[in-house]
């Protein structure tokens, strides 16, 4: 029984190591949309999902629809928005929202900010070898501004 459980865990770990995944650890819906695909024939199949609370979406790094570079270390730009009132956009550098970059086999976690801050949500990005790319504070998700307002 323990061997079967261990084998299942190894299988799960191996499969997620070959994909980038976006985890929504918030209590709100989150939209994740890949930037325009360089191959217009694949653009309609790019990653474009709305994730419910506590859910995830993954893309195997060799799938060219959602990882145009096709490698574990390819960089993919994603638009990350948190739905609700007020809406939030996540990105770095400040003012570049909603742009978040992930490697082809990395992970993005959208979660409540564990620190006391004006920004209630942050994004954590890790590479395939679990290196944290976002520093101790993470990437802040700021309140979205309506077009035409300052």
Task: Give residue spans per PLM region.
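Sec-dependent N-terminal signal peptides
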Residues: 2-13
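Intrinsically disordered, low-complexity segments enriched in small/polar residues
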Residues: 15-150
């Amino acid at each position: 029984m323990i061997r079967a459980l261990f084998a299942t865990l190894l299988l799960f770990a191996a499969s997620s190591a070959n994909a980038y995944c976006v985890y929504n650890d918030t209590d709100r819906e989150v939209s994740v949309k890949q930037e325009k695909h360089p191959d217009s024939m694949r653009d309609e199949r790019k990653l474009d999902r709305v994730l419910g609370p506590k859910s995830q979406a993954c893309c195997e790094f060799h799938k060219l629809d959602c990882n145009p570079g096709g490698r574990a270390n390819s960089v993919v730009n994603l638009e990350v928005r948190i739905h609700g009132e007020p809406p939030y956009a996540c990105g770095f550098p400040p003012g570049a929202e909603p742009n978040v970059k992930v490697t082809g086999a990395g992970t993005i976690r959208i979660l409540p900010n564990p620190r006391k801050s004006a920004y209630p949500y942050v994004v954590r990005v890790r590479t395939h070898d679990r290196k944290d790319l976002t520093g101790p504070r993470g990437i802040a998700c700021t309140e979205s501004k309506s077009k035409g307002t300052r």
